[in-house]
Amino acid sequence: MLYAFLKAFHLLGVVVWIGGMAFMLFCLRPAARVLEPPARVTLMHAAMKRFLTVAAVAIAVLFVCGASMVGMAWSAAARAGLAFNMPLDWYTMIATFFVMLAVFIHIRVVHFRRLDAAVTAAKWPDGAAALAAIRWEVSINLVLGIFVIFFVRLGGTA
């Protein structure tokens, strides 16, 4: 029962993080194009600030639930006197998670700080440049997230 609970929250974390990136790229950003640069950059800054917080919570949930599920599987194998051989799709999830986490941290620490400074100083071209960099890295993370979803579903063990 605990494993099923952890898996449900793990999947919820995936939905929030991947879905949030898709929403930002394919819905909010294109809709914001009708706004003048000061309003557009200010709106995207406010949305990114909220999204980065929500995504950080989703990432923490993913990590805690994923690590707990691996630990439970390892513990069950040990109790049964078996060697624990983690499936390839689990390794893929873990490796992709850490790559995506590094990209997320880079967005938050580098690009969002540039965006925040640009909005504070009302330097709209600088804000637009920071948003372009964020868009590129969010696109990378979205592709990685979709890849791992397909890989895991086709692998069939997760």
Segment roles from a protein language model:
Residues 1-158:
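Polytopic transmembrane helical bundles with strong interfacial aromatic enrichment
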